[in-house]
Amino acid sequence: MGGRRAPEGSPAAGNDRLKAARVRIEDVAAQAGVSMKTVSRVLNHEPNVSERTRQRVEAVVEMLRYRPHPSARVLAGRRAYLIAMLFDNPSSNYLMEIEMGVLDACQAHHYNLMLAPLAYDDHDLVRKVESLVVQSQLDGVVLTAPITDDAALLARLAALGVPHSSVSAKEENRHAGVAVDEVGAVCAMMAHLTSLGHTRIAHITGHAAHGASGWRLTGYREGLRRAGLRFDASLVVEGEFSHESGHRAAKALLKLKQRPTAIFAANDDMAAGAICAICESGLSVPQDISVCGFDDTPIAHQIHPALTTVRQPTREMGRLAATELLKEIREPGSGGFVNVPYTLQLRRSTGPVGV
């Protein structure tokens, strides 16, 4: 009563036998008429494979429904096919976007991703990262701010030969990775505010340990200079890149004898916190005080009024950082540093003075 078996020696018969057992890389190589090394290169998106060969191998992989076993890949290539994203950042919106971008790159290149939360100010940070790399057999790590700028960690990773790339590292720490011209972006935002007639503009900084905090403060001061405005230290309040710190900083600014007419917060979470504080004080945004941020994370669209902000393509930045890391893993020295463009997103949280 069973179905008809394919004639012995026919391609269909061969496929029947392959389905009866797990398809191996040897089966793909034999069917495609290439070596196992060539199949491995195609699966790992490595160079030095002709487009015609690549297409033939990919067609056989699809036909046989071959899926490489993780342990076999490790043994064949002496890699774990695993990278980690190291982070210590209170902005969950920002981290989620970066993480999704890193995942995009990992999935495209058949790698797995480990998320590793760390404390930047932990005196044992370097040892913990070294232990993570060794115990998990990581192929490399993506560093996010402020971990990107830990000199001792960078030196140890280099000494161990651990490939790494960074998201928004300081100029002197840039190897493989990605960044935006943050100083130029903030200058553009300041030009937007001054064009609306604002002359008393406050700034809520990020955490002092983050390179981005320094760049954005520099952009704020340069923007004032270009507009012919004097820097006033009383209008600068330190935050920590969190909603709570933005709320707290805005409360302090509202207590000034002469309050600001506009607030530039160093990220969207703090800008959202500032808007909450202003509304709680019985004032309106932007009628009484304009507010703007940086990043264009989802919260910028979720609050009311919608937030004017600098858009840096955070998901794309995560993808690019991981892509450059994977290049570095495959061929040391091949990973590069990529600068991505920013754009101003002008929304309803900013307006002319007194309007």
Regions found by a protein language model. Give the residues of each.
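Flexible loop/turn connectors
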Residues: 2, 251-355
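Periplasmic-binding protein-like
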Residues: 84-86, 137-145, 202-204, 257-267, ...
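Short beta-strand segments enriched in small/hydrophobic residues
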Residues: 31, 36-41, 75-91, 140, ...
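N-terminal helix-turn-helix DNA-binding module of bacterial transcription factors
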Residues: 1-80, 354
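Hinge/beta->alpha junction and helix N-cap segments in small-molecule ligand-binding domains
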Residues: 70, 88-97, 115-124, 147, ...
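Alpha-helical recognition/docking segments in bacterial nutrient-uptake
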Residues: 1-20, 78-191, 195
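Short helix-capping segments at alpha-helix termini
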Residues: 108-109, 160, 225-231, 255-259, ...
